[in-house]
Amino acid sequence: MKEQSFEANLKKLEKIVAQLEDEKTDLDKSAELFEEGSALAAELSAKLKTIKFKVSEIKEKQGDLFTEEINNDDE
């Protein structure tokens, strides 16, 4: 099974939240939605942490380049 994109999972989570906020959603369905939403939220959070780490690594490797660009802008 293909992994869903971050954006697709975010939209799915937004739909779940909307259903949970709907007073017509019964208790059993709410519990099921909450479990699914919690899992999606954890997955999205992990993905964001991974991307943040990758960006930090890139910036660290390219630190001299970024510093040079900033210093050249000051001149």
UniProtKB/Swiss-Prot annotation:
Signal peptide: none annotated. InterPro entries: Exonuc_VII_S (IPR003761), Exonuc_VII_ssu_sf (IPR037004). It is found in: Cytoplasm. Its EC number is 3.1.11.6. One of its GO terms (biological process) is DNA catabolic process. The keyword Cytoplasm applies. GO terms for cellular component: cytosol; exodeoxyribonuclease VII complex. It comes from the Bacteria. Keywords: Cytoplasm, Exonuclease, Hydrolase, Nuclease. One of its GO terms (molecular function) is exodeoxyribonuclease VII activity. Gene3D superfamilies: Exonuclease VII, small subunit. It catalyses: Exonucleolytic cleavage in either 5'- to 3'- or 3'- to 5'-direction to yield nucleoside 5'-phosphates. HAMAP family: Exonuc_7_S (MF_00337). Heterooligomer composed of large and small subunits. Bidirectionally degrades single-stranded DNA into large acid-insoluble oligonucleotides, which are then degraded further into small acid-soluble oligonucleotides. This is Exodeoxyribonuclease 7 small subunit.
